[in-house]
Amino acid sequence: MQKYLEKANVLIEALPYIRKFNSKIILIKYGGSAMENEELKHCVMQDIALLKLVGLKPIIVHGGGKDISAMCEKLGVKSEFKNGLRVSDKATIEVASMVLNHINKNLVHSLQNLGVKAIGLCGKDGALLECVKKDENLAFVGTIQKVNSKILEELLEKDFLPIIAPIGMDENFNTYNINADDAACAIAKALRAEKLAFLTDTAGLYEDFNDKNSLISKISLEQAKILAPKIEGGMHVKLKSCIDACENGVKKVHILDGRVKHSLLLEFFTDEGIGTLVG
């Protein structure tokens, strides 16, 4: 009997959060181990399906860097990185577009199998993500200048769950590779999302990454600004994205461990959560 009561308590604990976030836009940046491990992938899809089916409005922006690198190697296309960004010449862009489209359609299929009306897009569709060249040395890597959010608003209104590949275009219709974190942040800001969640390969934000007891469960925007200069590596960039989002209309940003099964539900629908909440 006790185990049944525990299950009931889990549902009851979730109830106020389901009510609070009903009809709210939740932007999820999906990448890392949560995309590469099939069991974790299924858990993420279940989480997102549940978010949708209980009344939230999730949107997914996905990466695909490792798959792009693997396909480039298979096809003999040279992969080069500068400051953590892939140098994207014409050949690389073609490979990236192909791989991201394949990932996108698989995600659509997975969610449709869970009863969700999902639709796949890339940033070129309807000029969703308008870009300019980020740096001449990076070739066709784009910085987003404009998000045509009306497209997404109309899809949400029609009960679709948009799944977006981070490929954009410029005014001359050139194709650009976009960092998926940047795309997720830009879209969340344009829609003034309730939440932006980054699925990562770390437990969250650490005050000192070498001290695993320094995990920060919650940090205000002002505290995040003070901490940011002290953080190094990829998490410094991630925290800057969190700050940017919170300063531009996104209410809360979450840094979650995508290696933990059902991390989205644990963060959004429980009192304690499991990651770092910024804002």
UniProtKB/Swiss-Prot annotation:
SUPFAM superfamilies for the chain: Carbamate kinase-like
Pathway(s) per entry: Amino-acid biosynthesis; L-arginine biosynthesis; N(2)-acetyl-L-ornithine from L-glutamate: step 2/4
Q: What's the EC number here?
A: 2.7.2.8
Report the top EC class in one word.
transferase
> Which GO MF terms does the UniProt record name?
acetylglutamate kinase activity; ATP binding
Instruction: List the InterPro entries.
Output: AceGlu_kinase-like_sf (IPR036393), AcgluKinase_fam (IPR004662), ArgB (IPR037528), Asp/Glu/Uridylate_kinase (IPR001048), Glu/AcGlu_kinase (IPR001057), NAGK-C (IPR041727)
| Family, similarity comment | Belongs to the acetylglutamate kinase family. ArgB subfamily.
Name the GO terms of the biological process aspect.
arginine biosynthetic process via ornithine; L-arginine biosynthetic process
This protein's GO cellular component annotations are: cytoplasm
For the ligand (substrate), the binding residues are: 64-65, 86, 177
Entry protein name: Acetylglutamate kinase
Catalysed reaction(s) here are:
N-acetyl-L-glutamate + ATP = N-acetyl-L-glutamyl 5-phosphate + ADP
* Site feature: Transition state stabilizer: 29, 238
Major place of residence: cytoplasm
Keywords, sorted A to Z: Amino-acid biosynthesis, Arginine biosynthesis, ATP-binding, Cytoplasm, Kinase, Nucleotide-binding, Transferase
